[in-house]
Amino acid sequence: MSGDAPTPAHDPAAEGLEASVPLESVASMNSDEGQPSAQSAPLADNEARLQQLEQEHSSLREEHETLRSQYMRIAADFDNFRKRQSRDQDDLRLQLICTTLSEILPVVDNFERARQQLEPQGEEAQALHRSYQGLYKQLVEVLKQLGVASMRVVGQAFDPTLHEAVSREPSEEHPEDVVTEELQRGYHLNGRVLRHALVKVSMGPGPQSGASPSSAQSNDDSTATFQGEADPAEPGV
C-alpha cells in the first residue's frame, strides 16, 4: 500500500563486511576503549605514594639533622666538662700541696736561723750541728723535687704579687720602690707563689746633711722594730 514505509534496499556489500569481522575483534576493541582509565588509577597511586615517601624522607632528614646537632652539642659540653673537671682536680691537688708545704716552711726557716746564728764549740757540738744540717739538706732536696724554689728579692723592684712590704726606709744605695732587705724568704711552687717574701722597701735617698736631728731620729724609729731581728740566711732552696 501507498501508506507503508519503504523497505530498505538489500546491500550485499554491507552484509559481507559484517560477516568478515569476527566477534572476538569487536569484543577486543570494546575492552581497549576502557583500558586507559584502568591503567591511570595505579599510576596515580604510585605518584601519591612517591610524594608521601619524599615527605617522609624530608621529615627524617630534618630529624636526623636535629639529632646530629643535639649530639654534637652534648659531645662538646661533655668534653668541656671533662676538661673543667681535670683543671679542678689539678687546682685542688696544687692547693693541698701548697697548704702542706706552707706548714713545712717555718721548719725550714728555723733550720736557716740555727745555721746562721749557732756557732758550735767543741767536737760534740760540731757533730750535732752537722747532724741537723744533714737533715736540713735532705728537707731542701725534697722541696726542690716538689718544685719549690726560693725568691731572690733584694735589689728587685717591689712587686705586691711577690712581696709583702713590712716597712719603708730611706736608702742611698737603692732607688725608690726597690727591695732593700729580705726579712722572711718567699717561695714559688712551679711558678705559683707559695709564700710572699717579707721585705723592706726603699723610699729613695735619705735626708740631706742639713736635715734636723729630730727628723733623722724619726727615721731611725721607723725601722727600729727590725734592728734586733736576725738577718736572713743565704738561700737554701
UniProtKB/Swiss-Prot annotation:
CDD domains with a match to the protein in the record: GrpE
Compositional bias ranges of the Low complexity kind:
204-218
Q: Which keywords annotate this record?
A: Chaperone, Cytoplasm, Stress response
Chief localisation class: cytoplasm
Region (Disordered) location: 1-52, 200-237
Q: Which residue windows does the record flag with biased composition (Polar residues)?
A: 27-40
Please provide one cellular component term from the Gene Ontology annotations of this protein: cytoplasm
Asked if the Swiss-Prot or TrEMBL record annotates the protein with the keyword Ribosomal protein, the reply is no
Cellular compartment(s): Cytoplasm
- Entry keyword Cytoplasm: yes
List the InterPro entries hit by this protein, alphabetically: GrpE (IPR000740), GrpE_coiled_coil (IPR013805), GrpE_head (IPR009012)
Give the source's domain of life in one word: Bacteria
What GO MF annotations does this protein's record show? adenyl-nucleotide exchange factor activity; protein homodimerization activity; protein-folding chaperone binding; unfolded protein binding
Tell me one Pfam family matched here.
Answer: GrpE
**A Gene Ontology biological process term:** protein folding
Q: Which PROSITE patterns match?
A: GRPE (PS01071)
The entry assigns this protein to a family as follows: Belongs to the GrpE family.
* Subunit structure comment from the entry: Homodimer.
Function noted in UniProt: Participates actively in the response to hyperosmotic and heat shock by preventing the aggregation of stress-denatured proteins, in association with DnaK and GrpE. It is the nucleotide exchange factor for DnaK and may function as a thermosensor. Unfolded proteins bind initially to DnaJ; upon interaction with the DnaJ-bound protein, DnaK hydrolyzes its bound ATP, resulting in the formation of a stable complex. GrpE releases ADP from DnaK; ATP binding to DnaK triggers the release of the substrate protein, thus completing the reaction cycle.
What's the protein here called? Protein GrpE
- Which organism does this record belong to? Prochlorococcus marinus (strain MIT 9303)
